[in-house]
A protein has these predicted regions:
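Conserved donor-binding loop and adjoining core beta-sheet/short helix segment
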Residues: 1-41, 136-162
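Polar/charged side chains located within well-ordered beta-strands of beta-rich proteins
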Residues: 63, 97, 155, 174-177, ...
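Acyl-donor-binding surface of acyltransferase catalytic domains
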Residues: 13-84, 216-220
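Conserved active-site tyrosine of GNAT-family acetyltransferases
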Residues: 49, 204, 209
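Glycine-rich acetyl-CoA-binding "A-motif" of GNAT/NAT acetyltransferases
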Residues: 18, 128, 138-142, 199, ...
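Flexible, substrate/cofactor-facing loop regions flanked by secondary structure
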Residues: 76-153
Length: 223
């Protein structure tokens, strides 16, 4: 978000002092607005911010899968590899990420950072054996990765090249991720999907994910 006039902050209550402090820090960074994250479990935050010029720009349904209770997933059905086996595909993955990131609902103004910056948060911190890549011959068509914390897993960004969307590749990646989670003893998998992506929400429901809460993202002026 370096090129956007917003600094990100979480507010878990309608706390004016916290909002003003976040605004002060944002202005120190040269930002004149805030992108505030909260959840539908604290609706008072939205009620606090909207009269101050904020509007909701995105909503994410956070769903969870009980890995042990979930049925064994079907095979992916498409050629898959992992970043552990194909580290040479890093630059291709970056190009897919750069194309896909602004295609997300509510992120049309976003621009991907440099390759080096993207690697620092979008590639290198994540388990290479759980970083799945869809292949067409030697060419990457898409990817999806897991973040792992103890026995809990979290679906990171899933990106499919525009020309390859609508072919079930995201579902193939998700089946591979569920299989990996089972093999590696994870207890739960969590995922967050924008409410304007009904096909992804339906995919989660099909594989046994259950909604837990909704994250709400607002943008507006700093105090």
């Amino acid at each position: 978000m370096e090129h956007l006039p917003y600094a990100e902050v979480w507010l878990r209550s309608a706390d004016e002092s916290a909002w003003r402090e976040a605004s002060r820090l944002a202005r120190e960074l040269g930002k004149d607005g805030l992108e505030v994250w909260t959840t539908d479990e604290t609706p008072e935050v939205v009620s606090f911010l909207e009269p101050r010029g904020y509007e909701i720009v995105r909503r994410y349904v956070v769903s969870e899968l009980d890995v042990a209770a979930a049925p064994e997933p079907e095979p992916p059905g498409v050629p898959l590899t992992t970043f552990a086996l194909r580290p040479d595909l890093a630059e291709e993955l970056y190009e897919i990420a750069r194309e896909s990131y602004p295609d997300q609902p509510g992120r049309e103004q976003s621009r991907m950072a440099s390759y080096e910056s993207w690697r620092s948060w979008g590639l290198d911190p994540h388990p290479a054996k759980a970083f799945f890549i869809v292949l067409d011959g030697d060419r990457a068509l898409g990817y999806g990765y897991l973040k792992v914390d103890g026995d809990q897993g979290y679906h990171g960004f899933t990106a499919i090249a525009r020309a390859s969307r609508g072919q079930g590749l995201a579902g193939a990646i998700k089946r591979a991720q569920i299989g990996w989670a089972k093999t590696n003893g994870l207890s739960t998998l969590r995922t967050a999907n924008e409410v304007r992506l009904p096909q992804m929400l339906a995919l989660n429901e099909r594989y046994g994910y259950r909604p837990r809460y909704t994250e709400v993202v607002l943008r507006g002026p700093a105090a």
